[in-house]
Regions:
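Canonical Rossmann dinucleotide-binding motif of NAD(H)/NADP(H)-dependent dehydrogenases/reductases
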Residues: 10-43
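Active-site loop of short-chain dehydrogenase/reductase
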Residues: 16, 65, 94-95, 111, ...
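Rossmann-fold scaffold of SDR-type NAD(P)-dependent oxidoreductases
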Residues: 21, 95-112, 135, 161-164
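Conserved glycine-rich Rossmann-like NAD(P)H-binding loop of the short-chain dehydrogenase/reductase
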Residues: 40-54
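The beta1-alpha1 cofactor-binding region of Rossmann-like NAD(H)/NADP(H)-dependent oxidoreductases
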Residues: 49-50, 72-84, 125
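A glycine-rich helix->loop->beta "capping" turn
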Residues: 64-67, 87-100, 106, 124, ...
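Hydrophobic positions on the long internal alpha-helix
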Residues: 84, 99, 142-146
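Catalytic Tyr-X3-Lys loop
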Residues: 104, 116-141, 160
Length: 172
């Protein structure tokens, strides 16, 4: 008698797409690799076209099954996000997974200097506004636009918001 318990299928249909914001950063690349490994196609988004091209090449060299495409997108600009969503709709690409990963991330080489400039008493309002525009407003706008499209066709989807460990662990 055959076992009636089916083996779990850990792969995702190749027709599923995940959009990753801040895709050219370390975490963005790791999210892309993990999703490609299980067969999900990836839409990389970031604000640096050269880094997007390089990240796409690097991921394609790993020979995953999923497709990799990219778009220049500024998460702090609703117009930029709408432009990308419209392009995806034109190409018949539905976003099934949204990973809100974009953030302002100082390079490790400037960490010592960054600690001095990120102390509350020296933190500029300009830097504050930028951090909120990318990390908070960007996640809101992407969730609003892509989440709205997920809800519109009643197929649902996944929205994953990535936060820094500094949200729970003080840097010093």
């Amino acid at each position: 008698m055959k076992n009636s318990m089916a083996e779990p299928n850990h792969s995702i249909n190749y027709e599923k797409y995940a959009l990753i914001t801040g895709a050219c950063g370390l975490l963005g690349k790791k999210h892309a690799e993990a999703l490609l490994e299980i067969g999900t196609s990836i839409v990389l988004t970031d604000i640096d076209l050269d880094l997007l091209k390089k990240t796409k090449r690097d991921l394609e060299l790993m020979s995953y099954e999923g497709k990799v495409i990219y778009y220049l997108m500024d998460v702090s600009s609703e117009d930029s996000i709408i432009k990308v969503s419209n392009e995806l709709i034109k190409q018949n690409i539905r976003i099934d997974i949204l990973i809100n990963n974009a953030a302002i991330n100082p390079k490790a080489s400037s960490l010592k200097n960054n600690i001095r400039t990120t102390r509350l008493e020296t933190f500029s309002i300009k830097r504050w506004d930028l951090e909120l525009a990318v990390g908070l407003t960007g996640s809101f706008l992407c969730s609003k636009i892509f989440g709205g499209l997920m809800a519109e066709d009643n197929k649902g989807g996944i929205i994953l918001n990535i936060a820094s460990d500094l949200s729970v662990i003080a840097p010093d």
